[in-house]
Every structure is written in C-alpha cells, then in structure tokens.
C-alpha cells in the first residue's frame, strides 16, 4: 500500500515542480521561450494523466473533508489526527466514568436488596453462580 502512496507522491512532486517552472517561464515571457512554454504545458498535461492513473489505484482511500479544511487554513493535517485522538481519549474517559459509576450502583443496589430481600437475593446469586454476597 505504501508503494502506491510513494508513486503518487513522486508524480505530485514532479507536477508541482513543473508548475513552478511554468510560473517562472510565464512571469518573464519572451517570444523565444515559446518552445519551452509549450514543452512545460505538455509536461503538465502528462503529469495530470499520471496523477489520474494513480487515483484509480487509490479509489478505496477516503480522506475526511476536515483534513482539507486544515490544509486550506494553512494548518498541519497531522493536527487533525492529533485532535481526533484527543477527542476519542476524552470520550473514552467519559464512558469509562459512566461504566465505573454503573458498577458502583450495581454493587450498592445488590447490597441494599440483599438486606431487604435476603432469600430472593440468595436465589439470584445462585442463578448467577455467585457464592458469597458482595461486601
């Protein structure tokens, strides 16, 4: 899989370099540089075709739109990954807190029910395979 990305990266780098060189030619255009301009335009067309071929190999890859927004804003796209991981960690901690609270509630509920309904709770524990009442 990394080979496909490397291939695309190589074509993109060549394409960007051709665009840069085209900008230099156009910014100081002389009639004598027409042949060089035509050559660069042909390289750009070929580069776009090469990139399109790479696209077909990577059709199953999806990139969240937020990553493109980060790039458009001049931010590092790796910050998106970092922030997603931080949000997932925070959500994980929140859910863990809820689970811990429910476990404590269950334990307290069983203790109180054991005080009020000792015979029924003994049956419950035997069905559940628990030998001793929770402390």
Swiss-Prot record:
Compartments in which it is found: Nucleus
GO molecular function per UniProt: transcription coregulator activity; ubiquitin protein ligase activity
Coarse class of the protein's main subcellular location: nucleus
Signal peptide positions (record): none
Keyword set, alphabetical order: Activator, Nucleus, Transcription, Transcription regulation
Purpose: Component of the Mediator complex, a coactivator involved in the regulated transcription of nearly all RNA polymerase II-dependent genes. Mediator functions as a bridge to convey information from gene-specific regulatory proteins to the basal RNA polymerase II transcription machinery. Mediator is recruited to promoters by direct interactions with regulatory proteins and serves as a scaffold for the assembly of a functional preinitiation complex with RNA polymerase II and the general transcription factors.
Assembly: Component of the Mediator complex, which is composed of MED1, MED4, MED6, MED7, MED8, MED9, MED10, MED11, MED12, MED13, MED13L, MED14, MED15, MED16, MED17, MED18, MED19, MED20, MED21, MED22, MED23, MED24, MED25, MED26, MED27, MED29, MED30, MED31, CCNC, CDK8 and CDC2L6/CDK11. The MED12, MED13, CCNC and CDK8 subunits form a distinct module termed the CDK8 module. Mediator containing the CDK8 module is less active than Mediator lacking this module in supporting transcriptional activation.
Name of the protein in its database record: Mediator of RNA polymerase II transcription subunit 10
Species of the source: Homo sapiens
């Amino acid at each position: 899989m990394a080979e496909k990305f490397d291939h695309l990266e190589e074509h993109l780098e060549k394409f960007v370099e051709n665009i840069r060189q085209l900008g230099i030619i156009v910014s100081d255009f002389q009639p004598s540089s027409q042949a060089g301009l035509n050559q660069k335009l042909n390289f750009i067309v070929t580069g776009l075709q090469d990139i399109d071929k790479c696209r077909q190999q990577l059709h199953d890859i999806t990139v969240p739109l937020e990553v493109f927004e980060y790039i458009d804003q001049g931010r590092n796209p790796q910050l998106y990954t970092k922030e997603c991981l931080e949000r997932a960690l925070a959500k994980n901690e929140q859910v863990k807190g809820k689970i811990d609270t429910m476990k404590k509630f269950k334990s307290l509920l069983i203790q109180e029910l054991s005080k009020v309904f000792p015979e029924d709770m003994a049956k419950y524990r035997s069905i559940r395979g628990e030998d001793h009442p929770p402390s």
